[in-house]
Amino acid sequence: MTIADNKKAFFDYFIEERYEAGIVLEGWEVKAIRAGRVQIKEGYVVVRDAEMFLIGAHISPLQSASTHVKPDPVRTRKLLLKADEIKKLIGKVEQRGYTLVPLNLHYTRGRVKCEIGLAKGKKQFDKRETEKQRDWQREKARIMKGGKE
């Protein structure tokens, strides 16, 4: 079940590969995510010391959050991947033009997971071309729907 999607990532990048990663979360973050108070549009993934971290994802704390814990909505969160996946991703990210972006947050067997994508940035004309394709698909569907009535 999807919790949050990063639609901006599909507009700004060509997604070449996808990986599912676990996230190290605190208790209040899990409660807030279950309540749907998460936004990953501004998030990105970095590699530090052969570990992956999610930066810029915003999890708004609930009003009933613990009094003794000071919630930080945009703290850096560690991503959990297998060692061979991390090595493969490090090799690809070091190539020019590749980056890692969070695509969505979802549940897998009750755990919150983050789907990350190995992405290559789109140029402005690529974005315009994608928009034209999307408009054409929409127009084609409208024509087909109108023709069946």
Swiss-Prot record:
Superkingdom of source: Bacteria
One Pfam assignment: SmpB
InterPro entries per record: SmpB (IPR023620), SsrA-bd_prot (IPR000037), SsrA-bd_prot_CS (IPR020081)
Listed GO biological process terms: trans-translation
Subcellular location per the Swiss-Prot or TrEMBL entry: Cytoplasm
RNA-binding as UniProt keyword: yes
Residue ranges, annotated region (Disordered): 123-149
Keywords: Cytoplasm, RNA-binding
One GO CC term on file: cytosol
PROSITE patterns noted in UniProt: SSRP (PS01317)
Gene Ontology terms for molecular function: RNA binding
Keyword Cell cycle: no
Function: Required for rescue of stalled ribosomes mediated by trans-translation. Binds to transfer-messenger RNA (tmRNA), required for stable association of tmRNA with ribosomes. tmRNA and SmpB together mimic tRNA shape, replacing the anticodon stem-loop with SmpB. tmRNA is encoded by the ssrA gene; the 2 termini fold to resemble tRNA(Ala) and it encodes a 'tag peptide', a short internal open reading frame. During trans-translation Ala-aminoacylated tmRNA acts like a tRNA, entering the A-site of stalled ribosomes, displacing the stalled mRNA.
HAMAP family: SmpB
UniProt-listed NCBIfam families: PRK05422.1, smpB
Family that this chain belongs to: Belongs to the SmpB family.
Protein name as annotated: SsrA-binding protein
Species the sequence originates in: Cupriavidus taiwanensis (strain DSM 17343 / BCRC 17206 / CCUG 44338 / CIP 107171 / LMG 19424 / R1)
